[in-house]
């Protein structure tokens, strides 16, 4: 089917969130004539109240590339102080912890007795953030230096969440809802090393001989996606509705999202898990996917043409609607085939009975027809909700084009 797809860019959300760094450089220290005391400086450290003293690794990891390219980052921390004298050099040092490397902030202050606030760049420990599978607590230590002399120190205790916890929205300090639904794209991880093993498994079943992306016809694109679908069914991947987290926050909305390896190894997925898993594989073989978000549900879309003029939809939860492994032959009989006769043509069934088709031929047809059913599952819903998708103010209906979002959102690397 030929359709025109419009997706809403998340870039305007960054302006709402205020992703700015303050770039600063060190200057020569000019010593004060009088000693400086901590009560003069009134050094304070605060963490963004909207996140209720919790650090979300997925948010930091997903936007790390945007920060690196643009010299901007979250205003999660705020340093405030009063300048005790003219022309002072300020340094705030954050000691290393489980979630960050040593981070130094520098500023040059001119006006005496003026209170200043800064939003520093934090040197996060990205590898540690990727490894945080369970919530926990971390203590951060800050030291404030005026012209090279330490004048004060502060400690801040924060909670950290699991890297699997995807923040898809929060209430800011002014009571406004900030949509972060596009963060689901961070769980699409085309760089996961396990994808190569999975693709070898797909090729082993000989549905396709190679992955060629858009180098062939639309039919060849569809066959590549079906080959992936068929392998998931042979692995007996089942639907699992687990989405809840232990997060007690009333301001931050989040959902547990399984990593690629968790789906691959445990053969369980909900609508989000299955969609980001398949999107990860499609990105790897150069077929461009998108995620479709509707109230309480997510499904997958993929372009069947490189110019994005054609696309198909796929209901990923239906991958577990059949169990190919329970169809087998023994003692001259075939077991459990009757459950799936609705997926088999009469011609193929008769050919099987007459010995002209194998049980594997039957299973392949069952799998393919389940794939076509999943392709058609959401067409009516898509057409009905088209106006909602095109409404930038309706955050419950969104389309997340992964290749477009890669400009700002990177895989979190799990």
Where does each model-flagged region fall?
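Bacterial N-terminal signal peptides that target proteins for export
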Residues: 2-12
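Intrinsically disordered, low-complexity regulatory regions in eukaryotic proteins
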Residues: 218, 243-268, 290, 372-373, ...
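Charged, amphipathic alpha-helical linkers/stalks
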Residues: 170-183, 335
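Bacterial signal peptide processing site
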Residues: 26-28
């Amino acid at each position: 089917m030929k359709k025109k797809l419009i997706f809403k860019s998340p870039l305007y959300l960054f302006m709402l969130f205020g992703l700015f760094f303050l770039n600063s450089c060190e200057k020569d220290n000019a010593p004060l004539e009088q000693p400086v005391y901590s009560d003069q400086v009134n050094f304070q450290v605060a963490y963004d109240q909207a996140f209720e003293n919790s650090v979300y690794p997925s948010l930091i990891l997903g936007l790390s590339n945007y920060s690196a390219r643009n010299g901007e980052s979250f205003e999660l921390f705020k340093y405030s102080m009063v300048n005790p004298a003219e022309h002072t050099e300020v340094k705030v040092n954050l000691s290393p912890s489980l979630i960050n490397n040593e981070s130094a902030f520098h500023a040059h202050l001119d006006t005496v007795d003026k209170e200043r606030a800064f939003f520093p760049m934090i040197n996060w420990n990205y590898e540690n953030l990727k490894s945080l599978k369970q919530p926990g607590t971390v203590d951060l230590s800050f030291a404030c230096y005026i012209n090279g002399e330490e004048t004060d120190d502060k400690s801040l205790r924060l909670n950290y969440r699991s890297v699997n916890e995807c923040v898809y929205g929060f209430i800011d300090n002014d009571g406004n809802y900030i949509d972060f639904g596009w963060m689901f794209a961070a769980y699409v991880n085309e760089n996961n090393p396990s994808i190569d093993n999975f693709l070898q498994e797909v090729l082993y079943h000989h549905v396709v001989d190679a992955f060629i992306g858009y180098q062939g016809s639309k039919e060849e694109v569809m066959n590549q996606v079906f080959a992936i679908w068929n392998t998931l069914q042979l692995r007996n991947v089942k639907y699992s509705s687990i989405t809840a987290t232990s997060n007690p926050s009333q301001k931050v909305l989040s959902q547990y999202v399984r990593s690629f390896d968790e789906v691959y190894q445990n053969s369980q997925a909900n609508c989000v898990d299955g969609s980001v898993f398949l999107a990860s594989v499609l990105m790897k073989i150069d077929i461009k996917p998108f995620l479709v978000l509707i109230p309480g549900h997510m499904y997958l879309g993929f372009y069947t043409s490189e110019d994005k003029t054609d696309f198909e939809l796929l209901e990923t939860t239906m991958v577990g609607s059949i169990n190919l492994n329970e169809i087998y032959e023994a003692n001259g009989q075939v077991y459990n085939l009757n459950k799936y006769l609705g997926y088999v043509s009469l011609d193929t069934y008769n050919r099987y009975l007459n010995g002209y088709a194998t049980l594997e031929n039957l299973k392949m047809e069952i799998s393919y027809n389940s794939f076509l059913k999943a392709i058609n599952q959401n067409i009516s819903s898509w057409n009905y909700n088209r106006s909602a998708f095109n409404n930038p103010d309706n955050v419950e209906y969104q389309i997340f084009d992964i290749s477009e979002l890669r400009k700002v959102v990177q895989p979190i690397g799990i």
